[in-house]
UniProtKB/Swiss-Prot annotation:
The keyword Oxidoreductase does not apply. This is Large ribosomal subunit protein uL15. Gene3D superfamilies: 3.100.10.10. The gene is rplO. Binds to the 23S rRNA. Keywords: Ribonucleoprotein, Ribosomal protein, RNA-binding, rRNA-binding. Residues 25-37 have a biased composition (Gly residues).
Length: 150
């Protein structure tokens, strides 16, 4: 059996007619329209807005405005300036493990990022997760190279 656009039908009971309130007892929702006898919730102009607590100071105004939420998916780096790399020998391949072994870094928790503060006088091959533009320039000026890893 092929389905054609003109033969499509909605499921039984999925499309109910809107209940017309206040149109007599025989209509099923006459008189008080299912809102009860008296009170704010039975009056016209109902319902009250979301968060309304009957005149009491609402929760969203009682609680202080929260600031300084942590940035979601923020990348944290172990940072190291170019000037600290002068302690290494010429032609060394620099990575996180070597820096810990040489005592330049202690207990790094995050990937390595090289910053461009200071002067570099040694030719190195630096492997890091990130470089600033000035750090990359200083490493390449001396004849070294920058390698990215994740």
């Amino acid at each position: 059996m092929t389905i054609k656009l003109e033969s499509l039908q909605s499921n039984k009971g999925s499309r109910r007619k809107k209940m017309r309130k206040g149109r007599g007892i025989a209509a099923g929702q006459g008189a008080s329209c299912g809102f009860g006898m008296r009170g704010q919730k039975s009056r016209s102009g109902r319902p009250t807005r979301p968060g309304f607590e009957g005149g009491q100071m609402p929760l969203y105004r009682r609680v202080p405005k929260l600031k300084h939420f942590p940035i979601v998916n923020q990348k944290n780096f172990t940072v190291l300036n170019v000037s600290r790399l002068n302690a290494l020998k010429d032609g060394t391949i620099v990575n996180l493990d070597l820096l810990v072994k040489e005592g330049i870094l202690t207990k790094p928790k995050n990937p390595l990022k090289i910053l461009g503060n200071g002067k570099l006088e040694v030719k190195l091959t630096v492997q890091a997760a990130a470089f600033t533009a000035s750090a990359k320039n200083k490493i390449e000026e001396v004849g070294g190279s920058c390698e990215l890893y994740n």
